[in-house]
Amino acid sequence: MLITDEMIPDSIAAMEADSKKVVVYRPRSLVVGMGCRKGVPVEELDQLLTDTFQSHGLALESIGCIATAEIKRDEPGILELADRYGVAVRCFGVDELNGMFDENGGNPPNPPLRKGGEDFVRLARDPSSAPHRLLGVWGVSEPAALLASGAVELLVAKERSARATVAVARTVFG
């Protein structure tokens, strides 16, 4: 039995080809933070998502939820994408999202959290003036992924298409 939210390694695929039975369990451990312009079709959002997961070796079957800004709660493309993957949409307000940045859109001055002997700061790393100008938030995909997952770091930092952004964090269990 293999428990993973990553793509199946070639060695496991080779075992299956040799008629050895392998059970793969996909925990719903990945949180997708997503932001987009109004009216972006589900196909465009799904392409960004699948390209991002493939380039980082992640399994789409392990998506636990899609996190976004409260203002995107009724965005058709995001709702259709969540339905396509059978997951919920979690929404966060302006104050929650901006709480991941300092008041100028930069990193907050709090001390870093300790993890594995290295310093990590629980915050989004790539503030953007575009969503701040339009929605009043410094970013959507990175802070939403961190907030929904409870993680202290992103698994995949913000990636962009022409009209959308995506970031991924792994859910903290226990």
State what each model feature region is.
Residues 1-72, 171:
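Conserved mixed alpha/beta catalytic, RNA-binding, or beta-rich assembly cores of soluble enzyme
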Residues 4-16, 22-25, 141-174:
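C-terminal edge-of-domain segments
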Residues 41, 70-73, 131-135, 158:
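Catalytic cores of large soluble enzymes that bind and process phosphate-bearing ligands
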Residues 55-56, 78-79, 125:
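Exposed, flexible binding/inhibitory loops of compact, secreted disulfide-stabilized domains
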Residues 71-85:
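Short glycine/threonine-rich loop-to-helix capping motif typified by GTGT followed
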Residues 88-101:
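A conserved beta-strand->alpha-helix junction
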Residues 104-119, 125:
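Intrinsic disorder/low-complexity segments
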Residues 119-144, 155:
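A polyampholytic, Gly/Pro-enriched intrinsically disordered region
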